[in-house]
A protein has these predicted regions:
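Long, compositionally biased low-complexity segments
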Residues: 47, 55-397
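Alpha-helical assembly-interface signal, strongest on the long, hydrophobic N-terminal helix that forms
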Residues: 1-64
Length: 397
């Protein structure tokens, strides 16, 4: 009797072990197959997103992706009687390209490839869809932008950074922020870039910085920021140079001897602003402007500033028609270099969302009218129901 009970117990244990082993094996097969099916879904990435903007993303809603996985599973398990496939469910929300985190991760990866020289500035345009709704143009493309509701403007580098007289600009190479900006300046053009493909904004980097709805407003906002930045830097140089300080003191004594200290500060600021205006003209004409000036790179003379200052009764006047002075700078950042400083200083979330804006605007304008970046995903979670159990698989680009 005891022997029979032991035999039954052993058989039960063995059968339980066999069943558990079988389930583990089935789950292993299902997990490997599930990863392969997810890989197939990821392989259907949008070519325009990839070729024009260096991003991987596939289009689809959760129900459609589940149907694809079900189809793959039924084909794979059709001749496997020990596997009973009971369907799948998918989760895409976490992987939307409209997520700042997801977009940033891809932008940083691509930015690193740009910095390494592996990826170049794209020379291809956006191809219109063969069978889709008609592309839209005009102000209609500005509707439902990812950055809608964000009002934060451009940030300048801190006055401490600008005023301490560093030879180099404050952009720190090698950080994720730096690689984001490399991505933006590679895949979006600024006002000085040659037109290689039709886009809505001529100055796309300027849009990222300013967020206005017209090129004119964006350019004006960026120029104002450059003027402010260069004025602070130029003033820092004037205050460090004894010869220039002596000139401004003498000019202040002539203009307002009874209030010389206050007038000297006004003259110094006016001189720095006049030099900043000239700096902006140089930058917008493709020239370089050193981050911190020296005697060779300083272009304006105080006499001209004083004449303008006196003519306006104490208010500096920078006439738009005045030709700029080119000191022939060899070193220093160009216009794109200064935009990089402004990009580096601005709010990262706003910056990423405005980059999404540009992609959505241009894709709606050139690809198909109902394009929304939120409908594209960079990965998926899938839950497979196999033999009464659940198997989870996850895959990203």
């Amino acid at each position: 009797m005891l022997a029979a009970m032991l035999l039954v117990t052993m058989i039960t244990v063995i059968m339980t072990f066999v069943h558990a082993s079988k389930m583990l094996a089935v789950k292993g097969v299902a997990a490997e197959a599930g990863l392969l099916w997810c890989e197939s879904v990821l392989g259907e990435y949008d070519l325009n997103l990839r070729n024009r903007y260096g991003l991987f993303g596939f289009y689809g809603v959760e129900s459609d992706i589940s149907e694809k996985i079900d189809d793959y599973a039924q084909r794979s398990f059709a001749d496997k009687r020990y596997i009973r496939y009971e369907g799948s469910s998918c989760e895409l929300y976490e992987y939307s390209l409209a997520s700042v985190r997801n977009f940033r991760e891809q932008a940083v990866k691509t930015g690193k490839l740009v910095a390494a020289g592996v990826v170049k500035k794209p020379d291809c345009g956006i191809r219109a869809a063969v069978s889709a709704d008609t592309p839209v143009d005009g102000e209609a493309v500005l509707q439902e932008l990812p950055s809608a509701g964000m009002r934060e403007g451009m940030r300048l580098p801190s006055l401490k950074q600008l005023g301490r007289g560093e030879k180099e600009n404050p952009v720190k190479k090698g950080s994720d922020r730096y690689f984001e900006d490399r991505y933006i300046q590679t895949f979006f053009r600024d006002f000085l870039d040659e037109e290689t493909s039709p886009v809505y904004f001529r100055g796309e980097v300027e849009y990222v910085l300013a967020g206005k709805k017209s090129d004119k407003e964006n350019q004006r906002t960026v120029k104002r920021a450059l003027m402010t930045m260069r004025t602070v830097l130029n003033l820092a140089y004037i205050l460090k140079e004894p010869e220039m300080k002596a000139k401004t003191a003498a000019a202040a004594a002539l203009l307002a001897p009874e209030a010389q200290p206050a007038m000297q500060k006004a003259v110094e600021t006016a001189w720095a602003a006049a030099e900043a205006w000239n700096d902006c003209q140089l930058l917008q004409n493709g020239k370089k402007v050193p981050w911190m000036k020296d005697r060779k790179s300083w272009a304006t003379d105080l006499e001209s500033v004083i004449r303008s200052f006196s003519a306006e009764k104490g208010k500096s006047s920078l006439k738009k028609r005045t030709p700029y002075v080119d000191p022939g700078n060899v070193d220093g950042p160009d216009y794109g270099g200064y935009l990089a400083v402004l990009l580096y200083a601005m709010n990262r979330e706003v910056k990423i969302m405005r980059a999404m804006d540009l992609i959505q605007i241009n894709m709606r304008r050139c690809y198909y009218g109902s394009f929304r970046i939120r409908n594209y995903s960079c990965g998926l979670d899938a839950e497979l129901k196999i033999n009464g159990s659940r198997v989870h698989v996850r895959k990203m680009y």
